[in-house]
């Protein structure tokens, strides 16, 4: 995703720590449900948000207490571009950075900043470690971005949230269509339970099957490969 910074070269710049801070509030893992727990593994690559974590920590521990409107970014392997605009309250593991917008700035604008390729490239430029590079928190907060008015921030942020919402809806539609295609293929070419002339599943209703030497399996009578 292209950065908006190149379109605003004439604007003065500020640093990320001028509009945001790391969340330091804590919450016990025993005080949240699984669907409110966020880890680097539950954050999805390429700005796809998150999925439900596999499990809570085995022992009660302190987690970063994120809130609605915070922006969560996986700090391990920043090039994977794992970011989520929180729509709920919960806890996240220590390898997830939770950013909270400062007073006078727009949460959705912060999300727009932190989802840009330029931000992830910058985070990688200061990352430490080879196998599992980890972003440098001090360096991350020095990331530069253009200065916008509060109204401009709101307009930019709202536009990006709207775009990402549409992308996610389209992605869900595509996922559903793919699942339907796989199910249809399975019915036709694995189970051979496509509908016969009577509207019943072919094989399950006693449809004739013959051995195919090439495929080494039975197939519906009359089919050729």
Where are these regions (language model features)?
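Glycine-anchored helix-breaking recognition loops at helix->coil/strand junctions
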Residues: 1-2, 40-41, 76, 82, ...
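Conserved aromatic-histidine-acidic binding/catalytic patches
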Residues: 57, 61, 165
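A short beta-sheet element
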Residues: 62-64, 68-117
């Amino acid at each position: 995703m292209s950065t908006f910074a190149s379109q605003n070269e004439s604007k003065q710049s500020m640093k990320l720590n001028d509009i945001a801070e790391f969340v330091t509030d804590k919450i016990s893992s025993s005080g949240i449900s699984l669907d409110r727990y966020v880890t680097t593994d539950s954050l999805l690559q390429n700005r796809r948000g998150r999925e439900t974590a596999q499990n809570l920590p085995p022992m009660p521990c302190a987690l970063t207490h994120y809130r609605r409107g915070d922006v969560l970014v996986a700090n391990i392997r920043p090039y994977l571009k794992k970011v989520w605009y929180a729509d709920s309250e919960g806890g996240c593991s220590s390898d997830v950075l939770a950013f909270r917008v400062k007073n006078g700035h727009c949460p959705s604008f912060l999300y727009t900043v932190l989802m840009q390729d330029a931000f992830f490239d910058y985070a990688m430029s200061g990352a430490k470690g080879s196998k599992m590079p980890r972003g440098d928190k001090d360096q991350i907060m020095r990331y530069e971005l253009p200065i916008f008015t509060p109204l401009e921030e709101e307009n930019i942020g709202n536009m990006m949230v709207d775009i990402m919402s549409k992308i996610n809806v389209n992605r869900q539609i595509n996922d559903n269509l793919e699942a339907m295609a796989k199910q249809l293929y399975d019915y036709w070419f694995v189970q051979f339970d496509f509908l016969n002339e009577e509207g019943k599943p072919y094989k399950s209703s006693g449809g004739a099957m013959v051995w195919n030497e090439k495929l080494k399996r039975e197939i519906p009578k009359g089919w050729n490969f």
